[in-house]
């Protein structure tokens, strides 16, 4: 991406008059606890999405100048006024949400709404970024972020902690220093990459806090810069926006590849639910990996963000199967879909190329419904009914070998769960305890899938 050019005499990039002034959109969005965000949409293809959190003084000329610059280069920008947001969070009645505040749902929802309004460009996981107090808030948000939700956390000269008296919903460690709450990060791998850059003007307590975070999470990247905060902020955001559209695999698809030494001569392909590759999809994939089944996970949120045709979906699946069967030297394929991902699997399987179709040893449909969609609906993600324009997966199963089909659902799932109807086409139906997410008993769910696979491989 071409970078914005600065005159050598400029002390700050914000000292120069912007060459492009973006107008805030007049469209309405559900913003949750974020009060009156400043939302800007680019013209043409979306190249990235940035949640730009202001410093302590609030949304002003410097933030608007940076937003203008990002929008001119193709980014969606959602500007957050730090003082008004903190005021809203401190006013929030936490008894409405189990005694704590969860900020990430508003960020995720707003990112999806705004990117959908921007057109049919690929979906970009948002970058959450800020300087000073904005950086401190970005780090606190990272303390409660699930996987595959935020694309990147980027902070410059962050302070230590945030002036919030209410609890954030997170198991991460917390300490109170004066009127500020200082959060650690949750155990395990980072939910998204974190970069913290420090200039000569950085707050020493803020740096000490990030260094403490890095002691527990070595993947955090700490950088030093002799530039001023605004300049290094802009330059780094350019690089991060460019990288946000790249996929780290030869097929150019939004995949999660979990390597394993195969012990069942089988690989798995998992289509995630509409929330993307996280939670149930990621956990089940990891458990299969530990059992010696290498996994390719397809992030349905990103893959189906723009509408796909059924044959296009099947052709991409054929490419995945062909490429990774050769790479892992396996004969069989375990084809799994969860929720939205389960709904598209039957028709996709039917349209596979003959060789790849013959390789499928089991089709595991988890929390199947009666409605197929080949595009993510923001309303569906918010819990509302989708149109099901792609038909009914039960009809798509007709003609498939019923001995391959395993449909698993939770006893307490919605009334419109489709698994019971799979009996009518001769497939195996398994009821497990729990709801749409199987009460998060993923050990039992994975065991059920593997037991079925082993039986089918023998038979």
Predicted stretch roles:
Residues 42-75, 79-82, 250-293, 297-301:
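Short, surface-exposed "cap/lid" segments of acyl-processing enzymes
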Residues 22-45, 223-263:
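N-terminal cap/lid segment of alpha/beta-hydrolase-fold proteins
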Residues 84-85, 224-232, 301-304, 432-438:
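Histidine-bearing beta->alpha loop at or near hydrolase active sites
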Residues 113-189, 323, 331-391:
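Primarily recognizes the serine-hydrolase "nucleophile elbow" in alpha/beta-hydrolase
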Residues 160-214, 259, 373-426, 430:
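The feature captures the conserved acid-bearing segment of alpha/beta-hydrolase catalytic domains
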Residues 83-101, 274-276, 295, 299-312:
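Cap/lid segment of the alpha/beta-hydrolase catalytic domain
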């Amino acid at each position: 991406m071409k970078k914005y050019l600065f005159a050598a005499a400029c002390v700050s990039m914000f000292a120069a008059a912007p060459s492009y002034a973006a107008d805030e959109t007049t469209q309405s969005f559900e913003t949750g606890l974020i009060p009156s965000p400043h939302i800007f949409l680019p013209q043409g293809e979306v190249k990235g999405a940035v949640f730009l959190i202001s410093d302590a003084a609030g949304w002003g000329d410097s933030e608007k100048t940076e937003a203008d610059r990002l929008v001119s280069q193709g980014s969606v920008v959602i500007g957050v006024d730090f003082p008004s947001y903190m005021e809203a969070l401190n006013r929030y009645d936490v008894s409405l949400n189990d005694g704590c505040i969860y900020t990430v749902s508003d960020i995720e929802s707003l990112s999806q709404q705004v990117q959908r309004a921007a057109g049919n460009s690929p979906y970009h996981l948002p970058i959450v970024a800020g300087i000073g107090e904005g950086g401190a808030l970005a780090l606190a948000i990272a303390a409660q972020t699930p996987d595959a939700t935020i694309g990147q956390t980027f902070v410059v000269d962050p302070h230590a902690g945030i002036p919030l008296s209410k609890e954030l919903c997170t198991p991460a460690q917390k300490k109170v220093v004066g009127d500020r709450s200082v959060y650690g990060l949750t155990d395990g791998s980072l939910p998204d990459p974190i970069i913290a850059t420090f200039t000569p003007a950085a707050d020493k307590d803020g740096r000490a806090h990030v260094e403490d975070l890095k002691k527990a999470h070595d993947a955090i990247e700490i950088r030093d810069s002799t530039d001023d905060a605004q300049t290094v902020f802009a330059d780094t955001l350019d690089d991060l926006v460019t990288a946000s559209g790249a996929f780290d695999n030869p097929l150019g698809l939004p995949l999660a590849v979990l390597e394993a030494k195969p012990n069942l001569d089988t690989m798995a392909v998992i289509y995630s639910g509409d929330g993307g590759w996280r939670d149930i999809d990621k956990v089940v994939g990891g458990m299969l990996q530990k059992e010696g089944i290498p996994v390719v996970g397809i992030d349905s949120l990103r893959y189906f963000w723009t509408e796909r045709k059924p044959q296009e979906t099947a052709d991409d699946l054929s490419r995945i199967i062909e490429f990774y069967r050769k790479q892992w030297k396996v004969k069989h394929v375990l084809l799994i879909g969860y929720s939205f991902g389960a709904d598209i699997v039957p028709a996709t399987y039917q349209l596979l190329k003959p060789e790849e179709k013959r390789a499928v040893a089991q089709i595991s449909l988890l929390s199947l419904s009666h409605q197929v969609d080949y595009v993510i609906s923001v309303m569906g993600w918010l819990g509302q009914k989708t149109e099901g324009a792609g038909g009914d997966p039960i009809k798509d199963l007709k003609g498939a070998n019923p001995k391959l089909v395993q449909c698993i659902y939770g006893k307490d799932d919605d009334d419109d769960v489709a698994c019971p109807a799979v009996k009518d086409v001769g497939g195996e139906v398994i009821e497990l305890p729990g709801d749409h997410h199987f009460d998060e008993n993923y050990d039992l769910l994975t065991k059920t899938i593997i037991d079925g696979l082993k039986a089918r491989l023998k038979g």
